Amino acid sequence: MRLKEIISKIEKRHSKKIDLSLNRTFNLLKKLGNPQNKLNNVVTVVGTNSKASMATALSAILKEAGYKYNLYTSPHLQSYTERFVFNNKEINENDLADLLGGIDKILGNDSATVFEILTCAFIKYAEYFKDNINIIEAGLFHRFDSTNVFKQNLLTLLGVIHLDHLNWLDNKTIDGVIYEKTSSLPISNIFINNQMNSEIKTKIKKSLIENKSKKYFFGDNFN
């Protein structure tokens, strides 16, 4: 019940469910001590479909191999706790209520969307397990998504891209979608994309031409 009350409270923090901007996210992260700069081993997961599948599959592989991970995904099926996994274990309701309640107090009179608050909460709590591999699924696109706060990644997983959420775009084309999802991706030790459509894959490569990540593309480097 306490978690539901806190969620209800933070839902009133901003008039819009989605408001594409990074200003509020960085403002809250600054109040939290910029925890995004203290996390290592960040894995960013972006795409149109299959983001959650890729993230959970990677977490299963890491667990089997004996690694510890933190996992942030959205949306959830039954409880907000499903979105938060730390040290290979889903957070419990009491701990999440404490976490979000603390974040809400620190935010003060400033505004932020629910997703922005949840993302910042995950990043802050992950500090306690900062040596773990941090798997973070992007929300809407990536450029102005609250998960886009890391300067460098261990790994970027880019799933299949196709037309989606066009109501949020001025450029309502596949080029517009690709730009929003890829132009802001951080430099990663490894970048993997499983785009099968050759035309879209070519556009993705063009968008990433200045990104110095070591890139692997389906059909080019693996099958």
Predicted regions mapped to residue ranges:
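Acidic, Mg2+-coordinating active-site environments of NTP-dependent enzymes
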Residues: N40, K130-E137, N153-N223
